[in-house]
């Protein structure tokens, strides 16, 4: 089967067919392009979906901890990888299918144009040969008619008796001329006819079959290319199936990793306050006064008894006690609320805390019907934190258990930072030793600012660790003695009809009012008085600052390079020395930043 022999006379049909083939190729390329756009949009939408539901972590505290959340975020990661595979499919189709189709379509157009031009040229050449043959034929026919006319004229004059011999001779010459020209045109026509027949045979049996064969091969290559692109279209999808299967397996593994018991334990770890549940309220017997009155038989005895009890209650007013959930309400405010339980001043301006029986009934109802008020203990700190407000730096606004965890996490982070700075200091010292031994490698003095900065960071981190460890010890100490305090409070209930709260606040008897000592400054706790020194510590030596120290942290003393200070307390092994300026300002400075000179008496001691 060959187009050259079977379709030798269908040039126009082959022209239309090859054009349709290229149009079909371009249409399929357009289909692939739209499929690529769909894959790209699908991948983009998947990535936007993952980005929308992924956690926006601004700190480590917001990292997911529950297994269900971690599993969901793992699924999002796998879905993000799946979106990446859809992008791979789009890229593969764009490179192997769409790009190849567009290049091949361009080549086909060029090749088709060339073959059709060759066919048209061959046809034009054959038409030219036919015109030459036709012209020679017409000329031969015309000369033959002229020769025939000349012969008739000669015969007519030759038979005419009146014609002269000259006329006959002239007609004979004309006949011979026309006959000669007819013979020449006959030979020309025969030659042109033979040439045309040869060219026509060559055209239909050699040239046209060759051109049509090339067109046929071109069209078959187009069909093969379409088949390859169909296969590449499917292969682009099939190549990513193993990776997509792994993504789906990862989602299944994430689903299997969900542990409900572990999540429940995390809830406990996250919200456990460390407080103990409130103890039982003691029975307060108010009827004993009535029974005493009846037994005495006089009303005056009851009055005297009540007077004695009132005098006893005034003695207890010297003890500072706090109500369980806040301040005692003012007498002129009938509706009780949690925020109106405190009375904070006396006529002379001193501040104190009072308590009456009405808040007891209110709090009993709150405990039974309202939501738990235990979180209100978070801000209690030795009975004064309700006035001072929460201290965020030491996490005192958190319950003991949560505060302990936060402090431990901070200490661990500070220890890691301290280890990093220590490693950097060691590396700088080694580099400094190398520079000192080999000056051509560098200037040892250039490392001094970096060493000073590193030492400053080390001292700062040590002080932070020391401060947080002190807070942690405070929390652990309170947690350790809470059971003993609870036991002692139960004994006090039996003796004084009172009750101690989990953080050291107290409730009072049924009809007694207990007032604490007046506070001159509401924003200062009793800790300030415990650490105030009446007399300044004596100087045991002096020191000179080798490096400057900024002293931004609380309790530190800023100093300039070369400044002379008094030593009032030696280094206890924590890297800090207590110093004082001449103006009396005191604070701690890094021991490694100063040159210490102690007096002989202090050295001997």
Swiss-Prot record:
Keyword set includes Coiled coil: yes
Organism lineage: Eukaryota, Metazoa, Chordata, Craniata, Vertebrata
Domain F-BAR, first and last residues per copy: 1-263
Entry's localization field: Cytoplasm; Cytoplasm, Cytoskeleton; Cytoplasm, Cell cortex; Cytoplasmic vesicle
Sites annotated Mediates end-to-end attachment of dimers: 165
Organism this protein belongs to: Mus musculus
Protein name from the UniProt record: Formin-binding protein 1-like
Gene Ontology biological process: autophagy; cilium assembly; endocytosis; signal transduction
Domain comment in the entry: The F-BAR domain binds the phospholipid membrane with its concave surface. The end-to-end polymerization of dimers of these domains provides a curved surface that fits best membranes with around 600 A diameter, and may drive tubulation.
Protein family membership: Belongs to the FNBP1 family.
Region listing for Interaction with DNM2 and WASL, in residue ranges: 541-597
Function: Required to coordinate membrane tubulation with reorganization of the actin cytoskeleton during endocytosis. May bind to lipids such as phosphatidylinositol 4,5-bisphosphate and phosphatidylserine and promote membrane invagination and the formation of tubules. Also promotes CDC42-induced actin polymerization by activating the WASL-WASPIP complex, the predominant form of WASL/N-WASP in cells. Actin polymerization may promote the fission of membrane tubules to form endocytic vesicles. Essential for autophagy of intracellular bacterial pathogens.
GO cellular component: a single term: cytoplasm
Annotated stretches, region: Interaction with DNM1: 522-605
Positions with biased composition (Acidic residues): 527-536
Gene assigned in the entry: Fnbp1l
Start and end residues of each SH3 domain: 538-599
Keyword DNA damage among UniProt keywords: no
Keywords of this entry: Autophagy, Cell membrane, Coiled coil, Cytoplasm, Cytoplasmic vesicle, Cytoskeleton, Endocytosis, Lipid-binding, Membrane, Phosphoprotein, SH3 domain
Region (Interaction with DAAM1, DIAPH1 and DIAPH2): 541-605
Interaction with CDC42 as annotated region, ranges: 245-535
Quaternary data: Homodimerizes, the dimers can polymerize end-to-end to form filamentous structures. Interacts with GTP-bound CDC42. Interacts with DAAM1, DIAPH1, DIAPH2, DNM1, DNM2 and WASL/N-WASP. Interacts with ATG3. Interacts (via SH3 domain) with ABI1, WASF2, CDC42 and WIPF1.
Modified residues (Phosphoserine): 295, 488, 501, 505
One GO MF term attached to the UniProt entry: lipid binding
Span of domain REM-1: 397-474
Residue ranges that the Swiss-Prot or TrEMBL entry lists as coiled coil: 66-258, 392-484
Membrane-protein topology: Peripheral membrane protein
